[in-house]
């Protein structure tokens, strides 16, 4: 494995990883929020500041959040409950298979870990035939 793959993740890695997955484009959703989509279905969204996601240290809205789809509630809980990871959730996402992360904290995971999480997010939204072909090429 190269150093570029095992280094700390950066916000720029999000675009590189997402756009490196099959049939992904950067579009928008929920208005004009930049969203990585596979065949029109979003799997990573840049979330705008809002009153439902406040920084507990300042009481101010987070300004650099990503919403990342996860396969299911158990995957969500595993990411949120691991104290070594920067992922979290808010009441607004109760019952929804997604986690949030501040882009400024992406360096707390490796690029490889981020790639795995974003690939899993892509797999949640990719059509079955595309998933199958991707996994077969694995």
Region roles according to the model:
Residues 1-138:
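Charge-dense, helix-prone N-terminal extensions
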